[in-house]
């Protein structure tokens, strides 16, 4: 989980039944209060049924599972969710192999630490869906993703899309935003579609508008002189 992977560590993983299936992701949640071995055995049973690799263990008060062989970490997390104690369950993004799993682990652990900032978050939730909360909590990787995936593509188109997001956040709807921008409401709708095409986030959805707003704020902070 710290990125300290060498041949001996991979050998020990193999001894625990890790077969080297890829891609790999990490799932994090609260450890159950009862027998941990019962929880990890339940994970192993599901993994065997689904033809996945899994290694699980306790880190502090968290139960961390490394899952190999799935392109759908959220699907695996949904199957594992009942094993965890109440609280957030975070599925990290997929990586190519076990020696890169620390990237997924860092994202999942960061998401776990910041999930309380989104009271309505689903359970489980992807670490990528917690980018704003992770960024606000000081996660540099999340900040960089918001800048590279949202802020920069929008800035590169000029100022119209940025000012449209600002107006939607400030005035709370298409009609009031169009009046503030002195444009027709259909122009705002067209810009909203362009925003979605460029960023994969729709300003029509309140949660996604929040993500866009945080991305703009973080990007602007990075441009301070």
Task: Describe each region flagged by the PLM.
Residues 1-225:
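Cytosolic nucleotide-utilizing catalytic cores of signal-transduction proteins
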